[in-house]
Amino acid sequence: MSSTSTSNTAGITYPKAYDVVVIGGGHAGTEAALAAARMGAQTLLLTHNIETLGQMSCNPAIGGIGKSHLVREIDALGGAMALATDKAGIQFRVLNSRKGAAVRATRAQADRILYKAAIRHTLENQPNLDLFQQGADDILVENGKACAVVTATGIIFRTKTVVLTSGTFLGGVIHIGLDNSKGGRAGDQPSIKLAERLRELKLPVGRLKTGTPARIDARTVDFSVMQTQPGDTPLPVMSFMGNVDMHPEQVNCFITHTNEKTHDIIRKHLDRSPLFSGTIEGVGPRYCPSIEDKIHRFADKNSHQIFIEPEGLTTHELYPNGISTSLPFDVQLEFIRTMAGLENAHITRPGYAIEYDYFNPQNLKPTLETKSIDSLYFAGQINGTTGYEEAGVQGLLAGVNAALSTQDNPVMDSWTPRRDQAYLGVLVDDLITHGTKEPYRMFTSRAEYRLLLREDNADQRLTEIGRKLGLVDDTRWQAYQQKMESMATESARLKDLWATPHNELGKKFTEQTGEVLSKEATAYDLLKRPNVGFNDIAAVTGAQVAADVGEQIEISVKYAGYIDRQQEDIDQMKRLENTQLPADFDYKAVSGLSNEIVQKLNDIRPATLAQASRISGVTPAAIQLLGMTLKKQKKAKAALDI
């Protein structure tokens, strides 16, 4: 990869120079392009096919455990995913609704066509953003810095920064049984030349694998023998700016199960599986395994739940969630027809596995800029993640930092949230600190400060930052300010209302909740009781605030003690986060560090003491030594400056 690449550079140079060129129009690419353009950067989104912008390549769903938290963070920063989901969602459910607020998660089944249309509409109406249909074959580099992108026909787009969001297209190989073919996904050509160019970088390249199930014609399915899975009532929304009126028609999903016959057929044909024959070298997602992998790994289970999900309102295609497979087509047809309701199923598209290139994310800066090439940013599956939501949030961050690097921003020259600020911060820190050898998926369990990182308060955590960055428009900002003002006003009102065992408010409270007061308390403090919700307090005090405002007040009251304790831990960690480690820090010169620790620190080059403390094998004693060394260096420098 250099400025001396051969045939491609013989083409024309496009007359307009850009601040940011984004390669790839998937979930990472669209959020990257929109973020950069919202910040005022002249941005180009380069895609091999404009018709597939925002395409849901696998399951037609957004959100879920840990994932909806990321979607809400994208939304709080002005991104497109949540609003597109509200416009396309054909079933909404809140998962873990009976558990604590930290792990509750909204999941939406989406109409593929409506979702793609919503994303494309947003892209086409975004100022400062141009679209261009053509694949990228090369990234030109001068003096160690990305400076242009060359398309398949040799068109050169000059740019200050490049954001690469290639998904599964880099060196993509599709597997169905023992047959394989080159492809970025079914029906799309892979990016071969760009993959070859990228391998010239001094970055460790790996191979990962993902897969998708067969699609089924709903007209050949007997839903009467399946369990019906309806959406929630009242309907949830995904975006802070969304509302129920945006939602299209709502539909049911269904549940069936595999059985011993299903498993016997799959076991019988494992020798024809590329996963078990050794044809596939890439590691697949641990938390979304293929059906053949599930049956092999969980041999003691005689049944697995399969969710039958509609792909949209205007199509008969169904997505059978839980039977991703790369077995031959004849085996797919045979095992699918063993399940209740699918005995006569017609497959419209076979399932397949896809193997693709990714790059070790430990070679990225916290901004998602590569350490090897300046002004080149990676986002999405190229960094070893899996999932639309993980891709989208990385794309937004890469787009933000690419834009910032081209601007003289008085507020900040780069931005990456801390682990206590956002799941995005957790994701990036995990990737750049630990790397990954398998597709990385977000879970709430990955966040040590998850009481603070709830999906319901993503706007309180990030919208003000988004406003400073230029990501949040006036409409969203005004809505956020009104919400915060409403929360403050209502909280103050409740603190001024006193209930006693004998006054009218106290009697109403007991009648509403069945709880007897033994002493006086404010309406605000009554929310601390486990069995009392904001709706109860609203009923007896005449509160008239939006549902999300009431929810926020209730959560803040009930979790106040836990949050305060967690905040103490965060304050301690912030001291380490604020201690920068120079990029050229000489770890060998620190007396007392073991060779193993020196090697790990040299390999990862942590940006802060906090990041260093999270590297496996780096001890608290080592962190103390590093801190002492930095203090000595700071004192020595101060003495020289006198």
Curated annotation (Swiss-Prot):
For the ligand (FAD), the binding residues are: 24-29
Protein residues bound to NAD(+): 284-298
Q: Give the record's GO biological process terms.
A: tRNA methylation; tRNA wobble uridine modification
Task: Summarize subunit and interaction data from the UniProt record for this chain.
Answer: Homodimer. Heterotetramer of two MnmE and two MnmG subunits.
Gene Ontology MF, one:
flavin adenine dinucleotide binding
Q: What is the role of the protein in this entry? A: NAD-binding protein involved in the addition of a carboxymethylaminomethyl (cmnm) group at the wobble position (U34) of certain tRNAs, forming tRNA-cmnm(5)s(2)U34.
Q: Which cofactor does it need?
A: FAD
Database matches in Pfam families: GIDA, GIDA_C_1st, SAM_GIDA_C
Bilayer-crossing regions:
none
The protein's UniProt keywords, in alphabetical order, are: Cytoplasm, FAD, Flavoprotein, NAD, tRNA processing
One Gene Ontology CC term in the entry: cytosol
The keyword Cytoplasm is assigned to this record: yes
Entry's family note: Belongs to the MnmG family.
Name of the encoding gene: mnmG
Where in or outside the cell it occurs: the entry states:
Cytoplasm
The cross-references to InterPro entries, in alphabetical order and at most eight, read: FAD/NAD-bd_sf, GIDA_C_N, MnmG, MnmG-rel, MnmG-rel_CS, MnmG_C, MnmG_C_subdom, MnmG_C_subdom_sf
| Name of the featured protein | tRNA uridine 5-carboxymethylaminomethyl modification enzyme MnmG
